[in-house]
């Protein structure tokens, strides 16, 4: 089956690790018109592109970014096309093609579990879409590895929709620290990369000083620096939304309906089933897991972090205008170089909740 470089609609779903992107991505994936690519920028890192591109990239960089994005959109490995849970029934794919594709995914995953990972890691998983059916496809690409490239990527894909998720600083830091303790991350904390952008420099962060900070404070600064860049990018885009993790967790059905509509999609029975099953889960939790008790997860950090740890995190967060997204937090003493999200329904809007 011949596959075009670009489908009818593209949605870029970005956020920091542990910010709620996976649940939102699988929410979209449950929709029968969505084709989902899970973190293809981990398969192809794009090291030839700048980590901290200019907020207004030039034409040459946009062209190079577009070539890279075309590669990501076409990446169909087990990681990018077979993330769990697998939603097989799609409007753009025949029933037979759906069954064959699901069987292939389960078979490749079984081979990976018995040690054949190096052989199967790059094995392509077919999309199973006839050329005539691509016009009904909405392709959703999720990334937690490229928050500083969000603006570059969105500009390189004119007409795309952007959704950026952001989590309360204490919730983000608590979850990241838990992951560090569990050894859940493939890569070590990269101080040099984090401090290379203008955002870190604006806050006066220097490598020698930063490395002496406790991990809790390093993670808090990571929340500030990366989210500041992404929110600055969102403010410059014509079709972008910011979503607070807690708002979506507290009202998943309303939030899903609004975000799907933003992407030109409706709330379907399959998606409603996913919302119900994934938010009312009462079993044992794992670090990387879509099915959770949403109500219990929202404020989990209040029990994981001591009052003193919460105060240290918030002292750093309050140095950023990001706290404008949480009115209950004290107004910051020091600003950064972007305006709070407007409330007029345009770029940078807080799509759900306050």
Where are these regions (language model features)?
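PAPS-dependent sulfation machinery
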Residues: 39-141, 186-210
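A short acidic, amphipathic alpha-helical/loop segment
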Residues: 23, 151-156
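PAPS-dependent sulfotransferases, especially Golgi type II membrane carbohydrate sulfotransferases
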Residues: 1-12, 17, 181, 186, ...
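Conserved phosphate-donor/acceptor-positioning beta-strand/loop module used by diverse small-molecule
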Residues: 142-143, 156-177
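Acidic-histidine catalytic/liganding microenvironments
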Residues: 31, 157, 237
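Conserved nucleotide-binding/hydrolysis micro-motifs of P-loop NTPases
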Residues: 42, 169-171, 249
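A conserved segment at the C-terminal end of the G1
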Residues: 22-34
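Short beta-strand segments
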Residues: 13-15, 38, 140-142, 164, ...
């Amino acid at each position: 089956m011949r596959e075009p470089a670009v489908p009818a609609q593209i949605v870029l779903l970005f956020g920091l690790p542990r910010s709620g992107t996976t649940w939102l991505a699988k929410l979209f994936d449950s929709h029968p018109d969505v084709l989902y690519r899970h973190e293809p920028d981990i398969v192809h890192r794009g090291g030839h592109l700048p980590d901290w591109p200019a907020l207004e990239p030039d034409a040459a960089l946009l062209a190079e970014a577009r070539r890279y994005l075309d590669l990501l959109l076409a990446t169909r490995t087990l990681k990018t096309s077979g993330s769990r849970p697998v939603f097989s029934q799609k409007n753009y794919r025949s029933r037979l093609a759906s069954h064959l594709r699901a069987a292939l995914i389960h078979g490749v995953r079984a081979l990976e579990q018995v040690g054949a990972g190096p052989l199967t890691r790059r094995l392509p998983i077919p999309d199973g879409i006839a050329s005539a059916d691509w016009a009904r496809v909405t392709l959703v690409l999720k990334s937690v590895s490229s928050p500083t490239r969000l603006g570059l990527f969105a500009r390189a894909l004119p007409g795309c929709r952007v959704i950026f998720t952001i989590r309360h600083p204490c919730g983000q830091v608590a979850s990241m620290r838990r992951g560090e303790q569990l050894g859940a991350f493939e890569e070590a904390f990269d101080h040099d990369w984090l401090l290379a952008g203008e955002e870190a420099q604006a806050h006066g962060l220097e490598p020698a000083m930063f490395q002496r900070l406790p991990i809790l404070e390093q993670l808090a600064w990571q929340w500030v620096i990366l989210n500041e860049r992404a929110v600055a990018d969102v403010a410059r885009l014509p079709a972008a939304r910011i979503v607070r993790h807690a708002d979506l967790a507290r009202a998943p059905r309303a939030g899903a309906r609004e975000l799907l509509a933003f992407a030109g999609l409706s709330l379907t029975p399959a998606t409603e089933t996913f919302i119900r099953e994934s938010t009312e889960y009462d079993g044992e939790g794992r670090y990387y897991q879509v099915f959770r008790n949403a109500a219990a997860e929202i404020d989990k950090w209040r029990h994981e972090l001591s009052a003193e740890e919460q105060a240290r995190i918030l002292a750093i967060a309050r140095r950023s205008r990001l706290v404008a997204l949480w009115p209950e937090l004290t107004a910051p003493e020091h600003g950064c170089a972007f305006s709070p999200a407007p409330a007029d329904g345009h770029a940078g809007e807080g799509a759900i909740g306050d």
